[in-house]
Every structure is written in C-alpha cells, then in structure tokens.
Amino acid sequence: MKFVASISNDDVAALEAVHFDGRIEVVETPDALAKACKALSKERLIGFDTETRPSFKAGVTNKIALLQLSTKECCYLIRLNKLPLTREILSILSSNEIKKVGADVRNDINGLNKLRHFTANGFIDLQSEVGKYGIEDKSLRKISGIVLGKKVSKAQRLSNWEAKQLTPQQQMYAATDAWVCIEIYNKLTK
C-alpha cells in the first residue's frame, strides 16, 4: 500500500475524528488489575500508551499516571497513580510473545522504568515503523491522518490524569490513543 510522506496541519484538521468504539475499563483496584492482566496475557497484539499529568513548571516532570493497554474490543486504563506496576503488568510489558504497538514508546518505557525497572520486549514504535512506508511525519495525529484518513483528537492531552475520577472525555481520549495504534499497524502491515 502507498502512503503520502506528509500531511499538513490544515489537512489533518479537516479530517473526521476517529474514536474507540469498544469497551473501556478503568482499572483502579488490585482485583480489576488482575482480571485485566489475565485477559491481556492472552492477546498477541496490544495498543500501548501512557499519560502523565502535565507540569507547567520548568524542570518539573510528573510520574506516569495512566497506562493504556488496548485490544480491538477493550481498552484497559490502568491508573498507575493508584496502583503499582505489578509483576503481572511487567510480564506483559516484558513479553516477546505479545506485540505492544504505540507511538514514541521509548519515552513511555523510560517513564514506566522510573516507577519500577523492567526489561521491555515486543514493542513496536509507529514513529520508526512508518518510515518503512515512506511516511515522514512522526506525530500520532499525522500518522493517523495519513494511514487511516482520520484524525486523533488531542483535546484532553493536557488534562489532569491524576484526578480522583477520569472524565468520559479523558477515558475516550486515552482509549483512542492506544487503540488507534493497532488500527494503524494493521493497515500498514496488511
């Protein structure tokens, strides 16, 4: 399949937005986490992303608050500000048997390693992958525009990911960001 190398911000803005239409599970308890990990461990391809509460002070960075792991049908929003990185999560993140596809995964992995060290295996970074198809743009928004012909909304990116409860808008944004990586990867490799 042939793709354009680049897309303008105006062209992306004119595209229809893509939204995850599957089930979203907010994971905040150890029991819910165990169930999510059990389900995810059976998958062979998972969409991957993280969210961090933004800092508006120079030199201050916050810890990752949310880990998104998505199948085509269900996205698990794991609240790392409320739960530790357990052995079960690390088993998934370290597995070569389960492909985890995301954008700019190196930064996400570095952030997760600050919470608990692990060896990342099985990760596919769309920012590297798209170059094989002649795509030069590296943002997820533009990659989605080029490959899927749809835009990913970034309206919730700077919201508070450590809030007591995630809003429906935050949940949809976070789920879409992880899930769309599967859609892009599948279209690229079709």
Language model features: what each stretch is:
Residues 124-146:
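Short alpha-helix plus adjacent loop in nuclease-associated cores
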Residues 95-100:
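Short active-site oxyanion
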Residues 56-73:
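A short alpha/beta connector and helix-capping loop motif
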Residues 1-46, 115, 126, 179, ...:
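N-terminal accessory regions of nucleic-acid-interacting proteins
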Residues 55-56, 108-115:
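Short active-site loop/helix that positions an aromatic residue
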